Amino acid sequence: MTGGPPYNSQSPTQQPRYPVYSPPSKTRPYYPNNDQYQQHPPQTPPAFPPQPPLARSPHYSHAPSPLPATLPPLNGGAPPSHHQESSSQYQAHQSSGTPQFPLPRPYSASVLSSNGASPYNHPTPSHAHPSSGRLDSLSQSPPKKDQESLYPIGGNVASGFSSSIMLSPPCILSDSIQKPARAADPMSFASILSGPTEERPLPRKQSPLPEPAPVQTPAPAPPVLAPVPAARKATPPPPTAPVPVPAPLPEIKEPEPLPTPLPRLEKKPSAEKRRRNVDQESRASESLPVPPTNGVSEPAKVSRASNVRKTMSERDTEAINKIIAEIDNAEKSDVESPGFEAEYERYIAKGKKRALDAEKAESIRRKRRRHDFLVKLGKTFEKQANAGMDRFRVANEASVIAEVQAKEIQDEKERKKDMQRKRRRENTVRLEMQKKIEAERKANKANDAAEKAKFLREAERAQRKIKSTKRALEGVTSPEEIGEVTPLAPNLEGGTTSSFHIGRSSPSRRKSGRSGGSSRPKKSKEQKQAEKDAAEAAYAAMENDEPLPLAPKEDPRKESLKKEAKGARSKEPTPQPLSAFESKGYNQIYEQIWRDIARKDIPKVYRIKALSLSTRQENLRKTAQLASKQSRKWQERTNKSMKDTQARAKRTMREMMSFWKRNEREERDLRRLAEKQEIESAKKAEAEREANRQRRKLNFLISQTELYSHFIGRKIKGAEADASGDAAVDGSDETVRPGKAGDHTIDLPSSVADLSTKVTNFEDLDFDAEDETALRQAAMANAQNAVKEAQDRARAFNAEENPMAALDEGELNFQNPTSLGDIEISQPNMLTAKLKEYQLKGLNWLVNLYEQGINGILADEMGLGKTIQSISVMAYLAEVHNIWGPFLVIAPASTLHNWQQEITKFVPDIKVLPYWGSAKDRKVLRKFWDRKHITYTKESEFHVLVTSYQLVVLDSQYFQKVKWQYMILDEAQAIKSSQSSRWKNLLGFSCRNRLLLTGTPIQNNMQELWALLHFIMPTLFDSHDEFSEWFSKDIESHAQSNTKLNEDQLRRLHMILKPFMLRRVKKHVQQELGDKVEKDVFCDLTYRQRAYYTNLRNRVSIMDLIEKAAVGDEADSTTLMNLVMQFRKVCNHPDLFERAETKSPFSLAHFAETASFVREGQNVDVRYSTRNLIEYDLPRLLFSSSGRLDVAGPDNEKVGFQNKYLQHLMNIFTPENIKRSVEDDGAFSFLRFADTSINEAYEQSHLGVFERAVRRRGQSDRLSQLGVIYDNEGDQTANSVLPHSLFNIVERNDRQAVYDVAPEGYMRDLMTVSESSFERQGLNVIEPCASPAASAPPIFISCSGQTALRETNDTFFSVPVRHALYSTPSRQLEEQILEKKLDPAPFSLPPMLPKPLSAKGRYTHIEVPSMRRFVTDSGKLAKLDELLRELKAGGHRVLLYFQMTRMIDLMEEYLTYRNYKYCRLDGSTKLEDRRDTVADFQQRPDIFVFLLSTRAGGLGINLTAADTVIFYDSDWNPTIDSQAMDRAHRLGQTRQVTVYRLITRGTIEERIRKRALQKEEVQRVVISGGAAGGVDFNTRNRESRTKDIAMWLADDEQAELIEQKEKEALDRGEVFGAGKGGKKAALKRKKDLTLDDMYHEGEGNFDDISAKPSGAATPVSTADNIATPSSTPVPKRGRGRGTVKGSSKRAKTTTERLRLIDGDGGL
């Protein structure tokens, strides 16, 4: 229970005595009552009244509790009301519920004072014992002095007046104990002036007293007049008669009876008013309390021990009594008589003033006493708290630490469990999401409603599971009960609380179910709203520091009990209140009992009751179930015959149902079969009609195109059309009559077409009619109209802006080309080159096309000079017809420089404007454009503008404003897609004629050729679906199925293409050109490649790929192509997946570091810079003379003594001693015969073994040579022994060993058997296989002294030692040899270290990947290594083409390893670098290999210096490879060109090559007109292209098995691989992507951009790139990226891939 202290209406609203409660620290101990420090302690209800004898015992004293009560009243009832009392007998208690001290209960009762002041401005409360109700003082026990100081702590020792008068109800006393009414109010004026009743009152002096009426009064008690305290309001005596203070009488006499007062005096309002005032004043007064007397307070008589009463004389007493009697007998009292109002008011004012003064003084004293008391109490509490805290810490610190550690361990376990649960739930969400998506997909594909509903239910279940799992994952649980956590929460039900509960309520222990315990009664809406409003009001009051509005707890039962008790009290006489126990010990025991009951017993009893209730309910439920079963038993008792009858009826019903179902199924099947046959017959008839309609439509389109081609062909070369044998067009005498432009007409025979026939739209033609005459006439009219429109458009090209140009330039102006007539064209004189015969024919064909205003396609094979023919056309127009442009040449980026150079070279008079570069550069170039004049002259700024496809699209708004005379598109396959923005922008340019240059008009399919025809003649070759399908589908299907194409269709196709396309092949027109030989070189997979390939194929399910391909999802197609790319990487080189890394042991060393090499100087000495992490620190003492046994010094006298005497004084090898010995023929006299001087002998004694060996190595062998000088002719050696070398026997006979004398031959082998055998077996070149797991340099000894550093440097960096061991001269010696130009042989001696055993040994254990293994890891690279070795030896030069740029990077490493010179060109090479790289290869014969990417380096460049072409990996498109190999096999090539194609056997590359051969067959059939045969093609159609790619991943056995299953599925009428989706899923496919789109160079969709280029392939800077959305920035390269999943780069569009193909990344 929570809540603050209950404030009633009489409680003052003042601030608490102590500051607001704040939670104690964790280290603060609890108080002994196990409750934390509370700001508002709990309250205690009044105790039970004790028995009267015990309460009135004079020896019984109660120790009052300084704290308020802590328990609520019993049974949750409202606390009993307390009367506000005017006096107090025990100041430690108070009547209100306000706490006196907001502190916890002390340890013992001896600490507190019994007379502490009240914290509020109220009278000090009295003890809970009510008085006995007697009004005389004789009924009280005499006071005991030892009880006056029961509690020694200072306080207000005065006591107040008893509250028994206020507690006891008024009653009528008998005559023997009755007292006058004024005695009940001791503060009244009459009580003060009253005296003994037996004496007569004094008469009044102011006015005569009336005659008193005889009133019977009882004998009063002896008059004891108490002094009036300052805090009380007293009625002043009459001013004329001052009343002295009477002294107590020694004896008490029997009073005389007085006359009874009149009844009207008791009903006076003034008396009641005075009594009311006196009661209020007494309640407000706190001064002059009466000390307790035997625990019972006196009624109203108090006296001070310090005041001595004065005795009055008998005369004074009689006078006073007489006056009192007169006052009592008077009709009105003296104060009620007129004339006393002012005195009365003055009296009231003085009384209030005295009361205020007394109250203020008492308040000051009370505060001082309270402060002293609280200071002492606080110190006592602090001392006890510190002691308790220390005891608690000592007792529980270890257990708390262990508990905290255990809690942390448990929390860590719980956290891990939570993470596991989280992962399981996340997996559940993912799996359920997949199930949901799968169910929704199946539901969308389901045809049956029931099946669809089932799938939807599965999806709904999965969604619910996902929702519940996500809720559990997010931690959302069911709402729990809101537990109150603040100790100051409002108690809206009133009453007091003993404790508050922090945290959530304990979970209910009731069992869920219908048989659970009884639930709480539901509250109405009004009650809930009332509780909510009350809570809001309470919180608002708490925020505003206002008293909380307490709502009494409503309980109907309690209200009824209160009413019954009230009625009973009204009927029965009110008993006398009994005194309750008020001792402190009693209250503590009482509170402890209730606290234990509330904390322990009540929950226990509640649990017992709840368990009993649940058990009882469970038993009742079971009993009810048994009773229900028993009551239903009679229903189960059925007759056996009835059961048998029902069973027979059910069996009969089932049989009947099965019979009729079978019958209906058979009838339904027959009906469906009949309907199916009818539908198939109708479909067949409709298909025949549609086929005839499509045939007529296609025949119309082909006839119209044929007629158009016939007209154009007869105009250009009339004989060619006659030779074609076209039966549909008869020979005619059509001529072109010279004359005016408007007179040009074409004469056709009347049998062919009616000239008056109007042009008919394609949509208005009736293709359902059987008669085709109208269609032929419409085709003839449309063809004639198309020819006329083309010529009119050519004539009117310049007529709009410059109508006078024809008159100014003469009648041969080319603006009217039809006026020229048939002119024989010769080579222009402006052209500096000599055209070949076929090129001159091409020039004539192009000029005739231009004259007729018709566009064309020059499709000569690559290398036959399409560029020079185009340039000759521009030269012819400029020279003959004075047409100087503007001409627009659009080419790939790699050929832009080639166009510029060839135009400048062959036609110097024509000015070329190269239009490329940055946006700023192009803006400057556009200033040379002349948009105002369409006629360009020789003096114009430029004549030909050369640019790339990207820039044309980028600046299309500027190009569209210029009228171009001629637009030449080089490599026109760049516009093979009619849906691309490039195709549409170029088609919108204003130009008179268009010329397309392409060596491969058909690359992947016939649709590309149709796009080119559509571009040159958009009005004729319109995008009709029928024509497009006839072009692509029919012809391709014939090529794929290896069937012969219809001769009529093939002839008509050639008839259509012949007027618009000119194609010559090298072998037909160029005899001097060398042959081209193609060879397929098959390679095998190495062990590493085979492992990679098998692992990849095992991880892929071919059936799953085929099923996904059947669905036709674009994402699945992309994934499939990525998978194909991975297989191609394996075939190329396994290092494309994972490079062999450099290996080294773990180095436990510290490497040298420097902040800047500037500080290190020119030469950085890194020797011994690698140091061990472990350093052995030695003290400087060990390196000084004091710590060394062999170094003399000031601190080492012993070594100095030894050195002095042993090394010098006693040393026989001193020069002086040796000289003396030699002179005296002593022991050293042998030196003269050993060729040794005195100094040499002395040095030999002081040098070490190594120094002597070094010196011995440097001595010349001069003694052994004397034998040659002294030899005689008879081969007898003369006496060549000199005296000074008499003892040098070894030096004189120094003969070389046989090993040195015979450096080669059999003799050397015999002398060096072990060494030669070791070398022959190759043991000296074996690479070490084992390497340590860790390595470290030797432990370094460090010392901080200079001596140690100098000695270490002398040892490590000794120049003579290094020179002797390694035979490396010093830097200074080398410089002197070079400066003096000396022979270095005498200065370079052989090293003293022996030759190492292994030639492959290393100084370190770092293993660099072997390049030899790098070559052998790939079957292709190993074969290429052999091939390049042969080609290098034969003097050939090689063009090496790749699909992947990363493979080019690996090839650079290989060429560097083999020391082959090379250059590189790929898509990232900048434009200027491409030109320089091509020029270097053409001009420098030392460059052996040219590395190129197939797409970027296979277009337009001339590389005739090479005679060998190697394709490391083939392209999807065979025409790309053809273009690449024609870079070498072209005009200018005099040698035979050999083409090698590396193919890995048994892999996907074989199938790709098979597909490429199929495409080549399509080109041969369409372009060359040959028969389709000789190549074995598969029969897979275009719709299953993605499935074909999936089949490439399988081996031959798997492919055969899959084809067999597919055939079986087709026989059953199903779609193989379509899955559960059925035929609808198979038909619902995305737009088919061609193989060229899906794999654009290895640099397009699958460009491996992980390696940075080298050589000439310099990355393009961002400043040179075009900042447009369509531009493709050069990707950053780095190891290990490639096309790995996770790359953030977006997929390239078709436009970007085409741009990358053209190598335009730098524009």
Swiss-Prot record:
Domain DBINO: 593-718
Top EC group: hydrolase
Subunit structure: Component of the INO80 chromatin-remodeling complex.
Binding-site positions, ATP: D860, E861, M862, G863, L864, G865, K866, T867
Chain location of the short sequence motif DEAQ box per the record: 970-973
PROSITE patterns (alphabetical): DBINO, HELICASE_ATP_BIND_1, HELICASE_CTER
Protein name: Chromatin-remodeling ATPase INO80
Biased composition range(s): Pro residues: 42-55, 209-226, 235-249
InterPro entries reported for this sequence: DBINO, DEXQc_INO80, Helicase_ATP-bd, Helicase_C-like, INO80/SWR1_helicase, P-loop_NTPase, SNF2-like_sf, SNF2/RAD54-like_C
Residues covered by the Helicase C-terminal domain: 1423-1583
Free-text comment on this protein's domains from its UniProt entry: The DBINO region is involved in binding to DNA.
Coiled coil: 395-478, 635-706
Basic and acidic residues: bias regions: 264-284, 426-463, 524-535, 552-572, 633-647, 734-746, 1693-1707
Keywords tagged on the record: Activator, ATP-binding, Coiled coil, DNA damage, DNA repair, DNA-binding, Hydrolase, Nucleotide-binding, Nucleus, Transcription, Transcription regulation
Domain Helicase ATP-binding: 847-1019
Cellular component terms (Gene Ontology): chromosome, centromeric region; chromosome, telomeric region; Ino80 complex
Reactions that this protein is recorded to catalyse: ATP + H2O = ADP + phosphate + H(+)
UniProt biased composition (Polar residues): 7-16, 86-99, 110-124, 1659-1673
Enzyme Commission no: 3.6.4.-
Location of region: Disordered: 1-156, 178-314, 410-580, 627-649, 722-748, 1643-1707
Protein localization: Nucleus
GO process annotations (BP): CENP-A containing chromatin assembly; DNA repair; positive regulation of transcription by RNA polymerase II; regulation of TOR signaling; subtelomeric heterochromatin formation; telomere maintenance via recombination; transcription by RNA polymerase II
Single GO MF annotation: histone binding
Role noted for this protein: ATPase component of the INO80 complex which remodels chromatin by shifting nucleosomes and is involved in DNA repair.
Paired cysteines (S-S): none
